[in-house]
Regions:
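Extended, polar beta-sheet/loop recognition surfaces of beta-rich domains
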Residues: 7-9, 106, 166-193
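Structured segments of extracytoplasmic/periplasmic soluble domains
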Residues: 38, 69, 162-165, 169
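Short, cationic Gly/His-enriched loop motifs
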Residues: 18-41, 46-132, 136-137
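Glycine-centered small-residue hotspots that permit tight backbone geometry or close packing
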Residues: 10, 83-85, 123, 147, ...
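An aromatic-rich alpha-helical recognition segment common to small helix-rich domains
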Residues: 124, 135, 149-163
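Arg/Lys-rich, low-complexity, intrinsically disordered N-terminal tails that contact nucleic acids
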Residues: 1-25
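A short, exposed loop/beta-hairpin motif centered on an aromatic-Gly-Thr core
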Residues: 54-58, 142-153
């Protein structure tokens, strides 16, 4: 009998972990399918090109192996999101060695919005009214202005300092509700330049 492949890669070796319970996909199966989709669905890559080049460790090609990790991992059942690069900055491989669960609020905090900012550095936009570069930080969906600058580098430096402080503040706020490794990673997080 041939295994049904999910996105041409993933399979279920039919172990103890269920894919469906009470007519709905289990949390572990949905997380696994979503991970596979982000890495191997070409239609998804057209919508979210940041996932181009991402892959899944061969150990997790089997749903049973992923589910075993999922249910033994802290915060897997708390509605948190699977993250591959908070512990290993720039990581492109989903694996049991690099993945953790983090709250959505922290996950989106670290997005760089490269596609929406054009050629300017992160946290910088051109302010037509002042004819200067404006540094701004998004806090809870609102922009906090950090100042106006004569060049994009100075604006970005201001943004970098504010963003790193904000990430540390969020780590302190979430301490005790996130894995210790996530807390330490956030406390030491630096914006890539």
């Amino acid at each position: 009998m041939t295994k049904k492949l999910i996105y041409g890669i993933g399979y279920n070796s039919k172990g103890v972990h269920k894919t469906i319970k009470n007519g709905k996909r289990t949390k572990s199966y949905q997380a696994w399918r979503d991970m596979m989709r982000r890495c191997y669905d070409t239609d998804f890559h057209e919508i979210q090109p940041t996932y181009l080049g991402c892959s899944v460790d061969t150990r997790w090609h089997d749903f049973q192996s992923f589910a075993e990790w999922f249910y033994s991992h802290p915060y897997s059942d708390s509605g948190y999101q699977l993250d591959k690069d908070i512990l290993v900055h720039g990581n492109k491989v989903y694996s049991p060695d690099s993945c953790v669960f983090i709250p959505k609020q922290l996950n989106v905090l670290l997005n760089n919005s490269r596609s929406s900012r054009g050629g300017l550095p992160q946290g910088v936009c051109w302010d037509k009214q002042s004819a200067k570069y404006k540094a701004q930080l998004s806090i809870n969906g609102r922009h906090k202005n950090l100042g106006l600058f004569s060049n994009p580098q100075d604006a970005h430096t201001s943004y970098k300092k504010a963003k790193e402080a904000y990430v540390r503040d969020k780590a302190i706020e979430w301490r005790g509700r996130i894995d210790r490794s996530v807390y330490h990673s956030l406390m030491n997080w630096q914006l890539a330049t």
